[in-house]
């Protein structure tokens, strides 16, 4: 048994140093190329409208606010200033979303975003995005990369196609630090020792983002009043939880396997599903020794089996917001074929670790 485990870990480490590192290097090169174009577009936006200041900065070879959706798809979060005059209201009526309401006694005129406040005093995510979309469309025509960048039509999101190969979504957002959403109040679960109290305090201080994008639960109902709501995102908190042990290596292997074998019609699976299931695996195996290099094969196997289970039940709860189902709106047939394909992949890796050479 131990010999089989060691063989799998050896093959996974080989897979990591060959396939995963090559994927990382290719993505890093793409990011540099894409960020040049996006920075130029955002510089042009800022000239027209100084309230939208580009926050895309490179720190230690990482771009703050940039998320890799897939090797050809990225999301850039554009942090907005001055959320202060609004109260964060998160009553759970819209899973995964919250609203920003003008604080009592505050005048609209005190807000930097006065014309985007609705009659009932809410700061409308949709109105801000609509204005931003207009500005980006104008900037694309003026910027120095106008020959290689186009705006993607037929969506309320701000999406660019770059060199006909890459898609970048630019999402206006507010950073919320020092508060924690009521809809995530159940975290951390009291009977689970992971993460420890110090890490929990760090994560809660890190806070979350409020994004101006289509709500998961409202896709296709854009005209409703609820489209004024903001989407909760916990990227920094999640990244902080995945520090230490073989967690980030495990995520890298999962992403690479997904990109190469689980990019299926109907797009049932993305890398965020992999990250979510890795967080649940951390809860199931709370001791740091469970995340030693020697356990990489066991942890990967556990996550793939959990993924199959989620696909078969057609439900994948968000890690911090369990009322939000990350499979919502995905075609059942796509989830079914993803379950079959994941099962084939897991069986192959477990019964014949050498097959990783070909995967």
Swiss-Prot record:
Q: Does the keyword Isomerase apply?
A: no
User: Does this UniProt record's set of keywords contain rRNA-binding?
Assistant: no
Write out the entry's keywords from A to Z: Cytoplasm, Developmental protein, Nucleus
* Disulfide bridge partners, by residue number: none
Q: What is the superkingdom listed in this entry's lineage?
A: Eukaryota
Q: Where is it mainly found?
A: nucleus
Pfam families from the xrefs?
A: Mab-21, Mab-21_C
The protein's matches in InterPro entries, at most eight in alphabetical order, are given as: Mab-21-like_nuc_Trfase, Mab-21_HhH/H2TH-like, MAB21L/cGLR
Listed under GO cellular component are: cytoplasm; nucleus
**BP terms from Gene Ontology:** eye development
Q: Where in the cell is it found?
A: Nucleus; Cytoplasm
Main role? Required for several aspects of embryonic development including normal development of the eye.
Into which family does the record put it?
Belongs to the mab-21 family.
Q: Could you identify this protein by its name?
A: Protein mab-21-like 2
State the organism's lineage: Eukaryota, Metazoa, Chordata, Craniata, Vertebrata
């Amino acid at each position: 048994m131990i010999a089989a485990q060691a063989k799998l870990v050896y093959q996974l480490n080989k897979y990591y140093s060959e396939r995963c590192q090559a994927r990382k290097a290719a993505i890093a090169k793409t990011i540099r190329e894409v960020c040049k174009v996006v920075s130029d577009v955002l510089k042009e936006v800022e000239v027209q409208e100084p309230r939208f200041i580009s926050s895309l900065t490179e720190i230690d070879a990482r771009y703050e606010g940039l998320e890799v959706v897939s090797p050809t798809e990225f999301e850039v979060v554009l942090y907005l200033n001055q959320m202060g005059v609004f109260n964060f209201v998160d009553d759970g009526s819209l899973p995964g979303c919250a609203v920003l309401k003008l604080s009592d006694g505050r005048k609209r005129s005190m807000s930097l975003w006065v014309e985007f406040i609705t009659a009932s005093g809410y700061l409308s995510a949709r109105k801000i995005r609509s204005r931003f979309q207009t500005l980006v469309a104008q900037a694309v025509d003026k910027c120095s990369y106008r020959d290689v960048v186009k705006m993607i039509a037929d969506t309320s999101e701000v999406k660019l196609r770059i060199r006909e190969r890459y898609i970048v979504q630019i999402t206006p957002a507010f950073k919320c630090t020092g508060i924690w959403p009521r809809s995530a109040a159940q975290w951390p679960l009291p009977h689970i020792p992971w993460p420890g109290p110090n890490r929990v305090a760090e994560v809660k201080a890190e806070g979350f983002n409020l994004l101006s994008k289509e709500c998961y639960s409202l896709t296709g109902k854009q005209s409703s009043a609820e489209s004024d709501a903001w989407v909760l995102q916990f990227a920094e908190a999640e990244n902080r939880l995945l520090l230490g042990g073989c967690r980030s290596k495990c995520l890298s292997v999962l992403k690479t396997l997904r990109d190469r074998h689980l990019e299926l019609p109907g797009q049932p699976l993305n890398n965020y599903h992999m990250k979510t299931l890795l967080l649940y695996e951390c809860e199931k195996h709370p001791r740091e020794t469970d995340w030693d290099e020697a356990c990489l094969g066991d942890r990967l196997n556990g996550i793939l089996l959990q993924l199959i289970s989620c696909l078969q039940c057609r439900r994948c709860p968000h890690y911090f917001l369990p009322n939000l189902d990350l499979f919502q709106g995905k075609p059942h047939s796509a989830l079914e074929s993803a379950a079959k394909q994941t099962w084939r992949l897991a069986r192959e890796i477990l019964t014949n670790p050498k097959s990783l050479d070909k995967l």
